[in-house]
Amino acid sequence: MRRGKDRWYRAYPGWIRWVLIGWFALAILAPFVANERGLVIRYREEIHFPVFHQWGVDAGIIPHQDYLRFRLHEHPQDYQILIGPLIPYRAETLDASNSNYRSPLGHQEISSWYYRHWLGTDQLGRDTLAGLVYGARTAWWVGMLATALSIIVGLFFGLISGYYGNDRAFISRGSVLAGCVVLLVVLSEDIGWSHQSTQTLEVLLKWGLLVGLFLLLLFGFHRVPSLKKRIGVPIDRMFLAVIGWFKSLPGLVVVMALLPLFKHTGIWSLALLIGLFRWPLIGQYVRAEMLRIRHLPFMESVRLLGLSDRRILIKHALPNVWPPVIVNAAFGVGAAVAVESALSFLGLGLGLDQVTWGTLMNAGRNYFPAWWLTVFPGIALFIVVYVCNVLGDRWLAQYNS
């Protein structure tokens, strides 16, 4: 086991490790790297931590304090900066003195070199370097969340499809009938289930009633002898049909069409949509591996021991189908980051208040002389996608060997 872990670890060349560590650090520490507030300040003879305090205010844990309204370049005399961030701007900070596309090589209106915009500004005076930092955080979370979602869904359906196939899954007629009745109730227009509820309690109550209705019907139908009879469920055939349906859809176009359905497009909703169209690929590989190992001697042995299907899948099948999942996860992160940047570049990604690599490149597209708005985010995007693909290739080579 130790030798196997070392072999996978050697797939990380030194430069790939440093890029991934740096990307992760920016994703976690972005407010400490680029911020318009000091990390540690002295205000009215008291020590404060504005960045930490702002987190508490945003979370509703602690009340707002007077010193949070001051910025690094605009503060009274009794406001002393003890420790400041590396970049004295947030991604959305407006510097009116350096608006209208200030070049990183040109003249800038600054009081000291600390406040210089090292990678230039956009039309509103927002710092490009700060935008790269916060864009790295957005790319990290979208890539990781979308990939995690696709892995969870793909693993579940791939394992179930490969293990049960078309001849091992059975369900009673009563369960099928109860499920159909509940589905008709959900789709019914007469009782208003199709309208979105704004009250969380009302939503929970409706779903609770649905579950109760299903259980009640299930109990009643199972008292009828003819409905107790079990019928086979061709799970593998159904899974392949779903996979074929997903493959026939242009994923990026469908994501673009579904985004307007969300009232506010955030990281979670965007990752959900991207992961929705990534899981079939992982599910295919998991199904193929499961079909390969399900008739091997060790799988037949654990079945003869009387272990439950859940324990067989989790303890014995999952470790054997995991390697191809890891390989596809590396490619999936790069693909998710590329899709997020493409959507933001087209103005269809996150909200207008979110700065991403795609929105920076979109701003550069509107004014061609501002080359820094396309070059630097493009380089960052290329490095991340390239690293993910190289890592996936190396893991694939290790897996095949």
What positions do the PLM features span?
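Gly/Trp-centered helix-boundary motif
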Residues: 1-155, 159-230, 234, 314, ...
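Residue-level signature of the transmembrane alpha-helical core
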Residues: 21, 132, 144, 148, ...
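Transmembrane helix-loop junction
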Residues: 159-163, 260-261, 288, 292, ...
